[in-house]
Amino acid sequence: MLSQASSISLGEDNSTDALNAPFETLLDANPISNQFEIAAMNIEYDFNLPAEDVVSYKGVKSNDNGDAGMVLVVEAADGKAEEVANQLTAYQQDQVAFYGNYAEFAQAQENVENAVIAFKDNTVVMVIASNECTADLDSAVDSALGE
């Protein structure tokens, strides 16, 4: 488990039991094809989340070309949930711009535009529908956050 570390340790399972239930709820609603696990390096460099803001996380993305599907659950440090959510929104905007460069990725771009980012207490979630997803992700997020 991470705690105010200067850098997230690579190669560790950075999830905690508290993240498993919301993660599984979201993954059930939004099955991700050809999954790859989001690594500590991605948390810091792709999402630009400072290590001191992240206690733990669990996430997967689709490794399929043109499928932006993703489920990410972050346990933010005390008082950092809103900052983490804001940084995930910045990531979302970057991804919208990226997919906008490719006409063949119109579905992925739309899915990123409609991503759901929410937080409750120190738990922050970001869900991008996979191309195959038909579930209502808003209600899945509410359920995952115990709303």
How should each PLM-predicted stretch be described?
Residues 1-55, 145:
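N-terminal "mature-domain start" segment
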Residues 13, 17, 37, 78-82, ...:
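Soluble non-cytosolic domains of exported or imported proteins
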Residues 81, 85-120:
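Short Gly/Thr-rich strand-loop-strand
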Residues 20-23, 71, 81, 85-92, ...:
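Extracytoplasmic/secreted envelope proteins and their assembly/folding machinery
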Residues 107-147:
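A short, solvent-exposed beta-edge/loop patch
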